[in-house]
Amino acid sequence: TSQVSTIAVARAGSKGTIYTVSGTVTLISSGSVDIQDDTDGICLRPVDTAGIERGKKITAYGTWDEYNNLLQLNNTIILKIEDGTLPTARETLISEITETLESQLIRVSGAKVTNVDGTTVTISQDEGATTTIYKCPEKENLTVGDTITVTAVVSQFKANYQLLVNSAEDIS
């Protein structure tokens, strides 16, 4: 657990293997955080998020696992929290959202809202490709037909990729 691996190396690992990784926090969710380095992104859980903020750099170790097809490090222990810089969101088309972007910060511009169902908002772009914004905090302000830009972290639930936003400010 002492040698720090790149996140790409950890993601290429195998179930049950312990990895130590270091990356910048891009998403804080209930009991988990997503981090990203220059090579890739990964979800860490469960995590006590006290003292953790977006943009902070953390070093942690955990056990490689998948939950509903989301690759993550489980039973995570945070070793260090230090100042960092939030990475620039990668401009992405919905049709480009795949496993290679999982747990990374992206930006989707010019997406049309096609459905609002509780806190799940479906958006479409580029010839009909769709995805959902899960637990969308700004749902009451969004209506079908709106054109929006979303800055979010790519997540996965079973066969579906979804976008997770930190706050309403991530949608414009």
Residue ranges: model-predicted function:
Residues 1-172:
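OB-fold single-stranded nucleic acid-binding module
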